[in-house]
Amino acid sequence: EILNTEELGGELIRFLVQSYPGVLQEKYDVSESQDIYACLEEIAKNRHCLVRGSELDMEKAARLLLDDFRNGRIGRITLEFPQDYEETDGE
């Protein structure tokens, strides 16, 4: 696998909690105050991402989160902000 989907999903969670507080709570009914892996676990539980009975499928939960992000189902989210590109005097 070229991309670690769970790691990428975790980074997306970290970004959303920091830059768009409340969006994960609203969309997935998860607590944003917990660590990233626990948040992904909660998404897996709430979306019934299971493997062999009751084992959580974290890969599937991460793919679901990433697909929702890519397709705009989480909302209008931008990864770049104007202040990231503001020039300082003398440049």
Where are the predicted features?
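Helix-rich effector regions associated with P-loop NTPase G domains
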Residues: 1-91
